[in-house]
From Swiss-Prot:
Induction per the UniProt record: By vancomycin, mediated by VanS/VanR.
Descriptive protein name: Vancomycin B-type resistance protein VanW
InterPro entries hit by this protein: Glycopeptide_resist_protein, Vancomycin_resist_VanW
Organism: Enterococcus faecalis (strain ATCC 700802 / V583)
Gene name, Swiss-Prot/TrEMBL: vanW
Entry's transmembrane regions: none
Length: 275
């Protein structure tokens, strides 16, 4: 039997534990030697590297749609802190360092989130859709991913987008961040906008790129193990030369593993762990 954490045994201690974690979380960033991106550019940089969009509303959660409306409200607050951000050479992007005070003037609403492996509602819930989008955008640039964690559980199918399997990025203030570092001599700029149906992510650069990046799944497997079904998705990145289309480089970035907690289509092949 797994031992319960102290905050699970005594839930009234949770707010104090969360406050403690956040203090240490942000203090750590003050003394980690990184130069964090914080400059907002008034003008858009000239070269568009990549653009993507994703449906805002997911109708497959099994929860009241009010939580989807609340999520969109939360995403709009967060987008205001990110739009136009410049990531200059040598700088590091931290999701939480930028979004930390997004609700300073207007409080977040309750949205869906996963806590202790279970889907629930929480103030500021739904923010992972923003971090997922940004991670997908960053993968299409030369920026170095230095901190990213995937969801260990998928409670419901993802909304329609051009993202492949295994490229999500969960975030939890005080615990889990999304960070990238600019090890190039170019400056990059991110924009996130929302219309009535979609959230749109863009990344621009101050110099003409010499190559583009394509992200694909090397393989996707579904395996029945430990009483559940797990998705194993290999994520590969190809660097393609502009003009010629020649593949300069292709490498496996990582293999993402997560538990699937919703019914898969009958056509999906599910292997047994001992095969």
């Amino acid at each position: 039997m797994n031992r319960k954490r102290l905050t699970q045994r005594f839930p009234f201690l949770l707010p104090m534990r969360q406050a403690q974690r956040k203090i240490c979380f942000y203090a750590g960033m003050r003394f980690d030697g990184c130069c964090y991106a914080q400059t907002i550019g008034e003008k858009t940089l000239p070269y568009l590297l990549f653009e993507t969009d994703c449906a805002l509303y997911n109708h497959n959660t099994g929860f009241d749609m009010i939580y989807q409306e609340n999520k969109v409200f939360n995403l709009k607050l967060a987008a205001k802190t990110l739009n136009g951000l410049l990531i200059k050479p040598g700088e590091t992007f931290s999701f939480w360092r930028l979004v930390r005070h997004a609700d300073k003037d207007t409080p977040y609403k309750d949205g869906l989130t996963v806590a202790n492996g279970k889907l629930t509602t929480m103030s500021g819930g739904g923010m992972c859709q923003m971090s997922n989008l940004l991670f997908w955008v960053f993968l299409h640039t030369p920026l170095t991913i230095i901190q990213r964690s995937g969801h260990v559980v998928k409670e419901f199918p993802e909304p329609n987008s051009d993202e492949i399997k295994g490229v999500d990025a969960t975030i939890s203030e005080g615990w889990i961040d999304l960070k990238v570092r600019n090890d190039t001599d170019c400056t990059y700029q991110i924009w996130v906008t929302l219309d009535d149906e979609k959230i749109i992510g863009q990344v621009f650069a101050d110099k003409q790129p010499q190559a583009l990046y394509k992200i694909a799944n090397g393989s996707i497997q579904y395996v029945r193990e430990s009483g559940g079904i797990y998705e194993y998705a290999k994520v590969e990145r190809m660097q393609v030369a502009l003009g010629t289309g020649e593949i300069i480089d292709c490498k496996l970035l990582y293999t993402n593993k997560c538990k699937i907690c919703y019914p898969l289509p009958e056509s999906v092949d599910i292997q047994e762990a001992n095969q």
